[in-house]
Amino acid sequence: MRPSEISNNPEVIRRLGVISINTAIEADIYGNVNSTHISGTKMMNGIGGSGDFTRNAYISIFTCPSVAKEGKISAIVPMVSHEDHSEHDVNIIITEQGVADLRGKSPVERAQAIIENCAHPDYKNILWDYVKCLPKDRLLIVFLP
């Protein structure tokens, strides 16, 4: 075992071409990921080294089930309740529904890939309803009451 000063060092991670796979509590249609807080306030676990690896990996992948609480809550949401990893660092999101490769995609294309490939079928229409409320040809964060 190496100390975290070496194993989590950004230069080492980049040089080795690490493919990082981490778990998410929820991911939003923009590609932002919450990996530490339930409902945005209740800490589930610490971020650990996932920030170092997500930011510096050759490919950063996040996995989660598409639903939580026995299907009562979608893990793919319009906006994460707490952001640990921004859309700029997340390359791929995987659920049991499928894979969304976000590399090189515009915000609109990212939302399409995440909703179509990762969201549970019971929640896809709700997510598309949210997207329809956004400005045409752009995907901006909109706070709906």
Locate each region found by the language model.
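Conserved phosphate- and dinucleotide-binding cores of soluble alpha/beta proteins
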Residues: 1-145
